[in-house]
């Protein structure tokens, strides 16, 4: 069941709706992080596991495959990922996730990540694309134990090329994020957009991106701030430090530029946060 969602969101299901569940458990074996256990129901699954980095790190790049046809009202995705002590993983998707117009029912997504001591997770899915008249609820929670490290990136696109004034608007997009850190308050973040307020909430922009990283410090803050201020085509960008959590916000109408900047920030801070030089997932270039 989705934490923070009403029970009514799960009612009125039909045979056309599908529920997909994926559970992943990573462990450290002989100095290498491996996928020890996998359980899945429905069309979401692990497409591929790569080890493109040097032998010293052995950080797997794991691609999560979601339905290429996109999601419609009544569909549900539940993803649970656990990193056992000392393990590391980079998770991404081979393509964007598309949320289409609904029949009055919500599309529901739940992501739960548990990072045990001295682990590292990079959660870097490709863009989420929200089409007009969609109803979406997304709940994502990260639990970090002492010594855990994390980088989270997300890009939200409203329409395939962003909404046009006469193109339409969402019914509801409700996105909740919680990052639980071991020694500080962490973050509770919510973005709720509907047909009445989406222009104001996004300040007229069509693409929103965020990046979160921990543990961070003031030096990392300065580095990222300089990257944002020196980038053109990003109309609004900001970065702040909440205890040990770095928070980056970007708004633009240029999908390619905002993606390039987000990936550039990741590549610069990865050695600081994760302790490894950046190796871009191959799927980002296909």
Curated annotation (Swiss-Prot):
Any matching Pfam family: UreD
Entry GO MF terms: nickel cation binding
Main localization category: cytoplasm
Domain of life the protein comes from: Bacteria
Cellular component terms per the entry's GO annotation: cytoplasm
Subcellular location: Cytoplasm
Transmembrane segments: none
Extent of the signal sequence: none
Keywords: Chaperone, Cytoplasm, Nickel insertion
Xref: InterPro entries: UreD
Family designation: Belongs to the UreD family.
HAMAP family in alphabetical order: UreD (MF_01384)
Function: Required for maturation of urease via the functional incorporation of the urease nickel metallocenter.
Subunit structure: UreD, UreF and UreG form a complex that acts as a GTP-hydrolysis-dependent molecular chaperone, activating the urease apoprotein by helping to assemble the nickel containing metallocenter of UreC. The UreE protein probably delivers the nickel.
Protein name: Urease accessory protein UreD
């Amino acid at each position: 069941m989705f934490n923070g969602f009403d029970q009514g969101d799960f009612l009125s299901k039909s045979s056309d709706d599908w529920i997909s569940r994926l559970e992943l458990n990573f462990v450290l074996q002989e100095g290498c992080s491996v996928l020890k256990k996998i359980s899945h129901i429905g069309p979401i699954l692990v497409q591929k596991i790569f080890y493109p980095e040097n032998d010293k790190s052995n950080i797997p790049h794991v691609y999560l495959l979601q339905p290429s046809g996109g999601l419609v009202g009544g569909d549900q995705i539940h993803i649970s990922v656990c990193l056992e002590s000392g393990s590391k993983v980079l998770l991404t998707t081979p393509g964007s996730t598309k949320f289409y117009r609904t029949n009055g029912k919500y599309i529901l997504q739940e992501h739960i990540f548990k990072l045990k001591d001295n682990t590292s997770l990079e959660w870097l899915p490709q863009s989420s694309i929200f089409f007009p008249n969609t109803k979406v609820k997304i709940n994502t929670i990260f639990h970090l134990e002492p010594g855990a490290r994390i980088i989270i990136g997300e890009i939200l696109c409203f329409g395939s090329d962003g909404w046009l004034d006469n193109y339409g608007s969402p019914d509801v997009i409700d996105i909740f994020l919680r990052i639980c850190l071991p020694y500080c308050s962490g973050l509770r973040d919510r973005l709720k957009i509907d047909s009445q307020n989406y222009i104001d909430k996004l300040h007229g922009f069509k693409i929103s991106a965020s990046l979160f990283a921990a543990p961070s410090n003031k030096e990392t803050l300065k580095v990222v701030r300089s990257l944002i201020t020196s980038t053109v085509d990003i109309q609004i960008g900001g970065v702040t430090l909440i205890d040990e959590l770095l928070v980056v916000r970007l708004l633009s109408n240029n999908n390619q530029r905002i993606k390039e900047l987000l990936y550039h920030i990741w590549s610069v801070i990865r050695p600081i946060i994760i302790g490894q030089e950046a190796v871009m997932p191959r799927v980002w270039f296909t």
